[in-house]
Amino acid sequence: MPKSRQPTAHQTAGSGPQLSYSEGGRSGTIRYTSSETSFDIWYEFAMPPALVIIGIPESRYWEAQTKISLAQRKDTLQFIADQVIKDKLTGDGYAQFDEQFITICTGKKPATVYD
């Protein structure tokens, strides 16, 4: 992702979860770490207006792969998307979610895009 080629860690205020990034060319890994769990998800660069596509565990595999309850999936994915936008974009950005991917796009969120 833009901004850095070295592994980096970013943390929200307080002792909340952290994301760290391992970057290698057109793809890499995002590590989510909290006091309860840690897991890796992959990403790769995309075609505009998308910047990056992040692969996420499907609902049926979520708890086994992340050790986070299914009830917390939406909030966890929103945190990841918001933090990637904050850490890696220099301007506006928004996220689109589906069962297997988070797509991070540059610019303002169009009125026709649904979460």
Question: Could you say what each language-model-derived stretch is?
Answer:
Residues 10-48:
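Amphipathic, interaction-prone secondary-structure segments
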Residues 1, 15, 36, 49, ...:
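Intrinsic-disorder/low-complexity loop/linker signature
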Residues 55-115:
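Acidic, low-complexity intrinsically disordered segments
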Residues 47-57:
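Short, surface-exposed linear segments at secondary-structure transitions and domain or protein termini
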Residues 1-18, 77, 108-109:
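Short, basic/low-complexity N-terminal boundary segments at the transition from targeting/disordered tails
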Residues 12-14, 22-26, 53, 89-91, ...:
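Intrinsically disordered, low-complexity segments enriched in small/polar residues
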Residues 8-11, 32, 74-75, 82:
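A short linear-motif detector with a strong N-terminal bias
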